[in-house]
Amino acid sequence: MHRIDVKILDDRLRTHEPAYATPGAAGLDLRACLNAPVTLHPGETTLIPSGLAIHLADPGLAAMVLPRSGLGHKHGIVLGNLVGLIDSDYQGQIFVSAWNRGRETFTVQPMERIAQLVVVPVLQVGFNIVDEFPQSDRGAAGFGSTGKH
């Protein structure tokens, strides 16, 4: 298991330390480190502190903040930026951009699990500037070009 440095910025997390819920879990739950409930009306967004800061340190790693599937499907609560990308050299607190895309008001409770954090490998690349690409079967065919079924 790869280990990274984590700062706990909210003491309430000392009893809710980040952990994988199951041996096969890809993401760690992020909690809403709020002092009071926050109400999100339909269409509203807000930044919610996670109470955590991470330092991946390895440029071969990045972290992604992703929505929790149940919140999105059942309540319409997703991420305002769709995916949050945490670079390996970022050391500040992780915030969750919560967006209520649903039709009903939703209240985020203090310490509620609001998103998940997934650490992924990253490959930085260099560019070869070319005038043309070698021919491929697909070429520049875009959206829908590989068929419906």
From Swiss-Prot:
Keywords: Hydrolase, Magnesium, Metal-binding, Nucleotide metabolism. Pathway: Pyrimidine metabolism; dUMP biosynthesis; dUMP from dCTP (dUTP route): step 2/2. GO terms for biological process: dUMP biosynthetic process; dUTP catabolic process. InterPro entries: dUTPase, dUTPase-like, dUTPase-like_sf, dUTPase_trimeric. The keyword Zinc does not apply. Its cofactor is Mg(2+). The keyword Nuclease does not apply. This enzyme is involved in nucleotide metabolism: it produces dUMP, the immediate precursor of thymidine nucleotides and it decreases the intracellular concentration of dUTP so that uracil cannot be incorporated into DNA. This is Deoxyuridine 5'-triphosphate nucleotidohydrolase. It comes from Aromatoleum aromaticum (strain DSM 19018 / LMG 30748 / EbN1) (Azoarcus sp. (strain EbN1)).
